[in-house]
């Protein structure tokens, strides 16, 4: 019987390097750091690989995903697998089971989940996972206990035979309730039977450490390509901003911080050279950018938009070597022993809102580095990249390519 995995993901957080925290002298901090540092490199490599696969499939479209959320959802799913299916899934996520046990992998994700869930008062964030199982199947209690322990998740039973009037409404109602109405209508229908659905939901609203000037936002042109121009509200701030004109890649970038752990890289490739920059994306590139950014006087223009992406990852994961899940060879015997399951869909949705709000009052939007210096003007009015990371966990929370923000 086919298994349908749906993942709805809405994430926004921030950035950092993958090794620096080992230098912190505080023992408790280092102990916690060890857990999420283990995941950082693995998750980052998976993130860039998945992102590049999606970009290749949609060369002229927006691409926006929450990589760490996808890794977490698939790692959670692996708790229900056995044998070659389990080994292939974890290997596809980047783990070497001869170096790191399955228990250690899930313990690391457990710490990561806890850290991401502990947002400060300046953030509004709701995140969670849930599994919906066909009520005709008997769930193994050990699986339910494991996903509760490691991922704070739960399994709910539904009547999937009555999808239109019962199952879809119950799932949508569950997510709407958990996110206080921020995520609605996760499902509208299925074109094939389902016995198991996995959802992963996140709502995030952050505030900039340095806000954009509300009074300066105005409609401007965004040049999608040589023949397409759209109108977007363009935000503005002027002040001391971390900036880099890359000497190795054809791009400029700035780094902006949210209150709390969030940080965002906005990357502006030269016209026609977007693919060169995307091909070079890696942990080493991010480390080099982080080291090269310098405080500069910048006049910054960024679209005020909602960026989103929704994908069925089935074919992409198969291309990346995670194929057993979708065949009759799939082994989900740690979820139920009542039926032979296989995965039919992996659905992911990510949404990010860019707005002016910050922790400071709007008026003077920045600190001037040198009143006599001519500011660098960065206007994101053509296709650009956005990358959102978390300072504390070094997690890749959003990777995006914005071709048309309208």
Curated annotation (Swiss-Prot):
Major transport protein for glucocorticoids and progestins in the blood of almost all vertebrate species. Cortisol binds at residues 255, 287, 394. The keyword Secreted applies. GO terms for cellular component: extracellular space. The record marks 251 as: Conserved cysteine within steroid binding domain. Expressed by the liver; secreted in plasma. It comes from Saimiri sciureus. Glycans are attached at residues 31, 96, 261, 331, 360. Belongs to the serpin family. SUPFAM superfamilies: Serpins (SSF56574). Proteolytic cleavage leads to an important conformation change. This reduces the affinity for steroids. Residues 1-22 form the signal peptide. Keywords: Glycoprotein, Lipid-binding, Secreted, Signal, Steroid-binding, Transport. This is Corticosteroid-binding globulin. It comes from the Eukaryota. GO terms for molecular function: serine-type endopeptidase inhibitor activity; steroid binding. Its main location: secreted. InterPro entries: Serpin_CS, Serpin_dom, Serpin_fam, Serpin_sf, Serpin_sf_1, Serpin_sf_2. Pfam families: Serpin. It is found in: Secreted. Coiled coil: none annotated.
């Amino acid at each position: 019987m086919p298994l349908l995995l749906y993942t709805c993901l809405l994430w926004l957080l921030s950035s950092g390097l993958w090794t620096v925290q080992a230098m912190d002298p505080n023992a408790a901090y280092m102990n916690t750091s060890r857990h999420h540092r283990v995941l950082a490199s693995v998750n980052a490599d998976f993130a860039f690989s998945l992102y590049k696969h999606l970009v290749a499939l949609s060369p002229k479209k927006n691409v926006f995903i929450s990589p760490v959320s996808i890794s977490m959802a698939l790692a959670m799913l692996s708790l229900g697998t056995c044998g070659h299916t389990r080994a292939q899934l974890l290997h596809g996520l980047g783990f070497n089971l001869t170096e790191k046990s399955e228990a250690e992998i899930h313990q690391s994700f457990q710490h990561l989940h806890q850290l991401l869930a502990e947002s400060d008062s300046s953030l509004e964030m709701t995140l969670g996972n849930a599994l919906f199982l066909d009520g005709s199947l008997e769930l193994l209690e050990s699986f339910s206990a494991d996903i509760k322990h490691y991922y704070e998740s739960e399994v709910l039973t539904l009547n999937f035979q009555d999808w239109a009037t019962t199952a879809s409404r119950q799932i949508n109602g569950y997510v709407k309730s958990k996110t206080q109405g921020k995520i609605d209508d996760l499902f509208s229908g299925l074109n094939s039977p389902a016995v198991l659905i996995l959802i992963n939901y996140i709502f995030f609203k952050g505030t900039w450490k340095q806000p954009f000037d509300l009074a300066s936002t105005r409609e401007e042109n965004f040049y999608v390509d040589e023949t397409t121009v759209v109108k977007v509200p363009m935000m503005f701030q002027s002040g001391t901003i971390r900036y880099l004109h890359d000497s190795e890649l054809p791009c400029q970038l700035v780094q902006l911080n949210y209150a709390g752990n969030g940080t965002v890289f906005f990357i502006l490739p030269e016209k026609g050279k977007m693919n060169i920059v995307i091909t070079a994306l890696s942990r080493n590139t991010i480390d080099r950018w982080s080291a090269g950014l310098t405080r500069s006087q910048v006049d910054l223009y960024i679209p005020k938009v909602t960026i989103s992406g929704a994908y069925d990852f089935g074919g992409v994961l198969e291309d990346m070597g995670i194929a057993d899940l979708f065949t009759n060879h799939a082994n989900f015997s740690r979820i139920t022993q009542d039926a032979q399951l296989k995965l039919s869909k992996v659905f992911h949705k990510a949404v990010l809102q860019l707005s002016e709000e910050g922790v400071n009052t709007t008026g003077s939007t920045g600190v001037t580095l040198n009143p006599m210096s001519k500011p660098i003007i960065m206007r994101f009015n053509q296709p650009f990249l956005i990358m959102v990371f978390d300072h504390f966990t070094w997690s890749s929370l959003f990777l995006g390519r914005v071709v048309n923000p309208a």
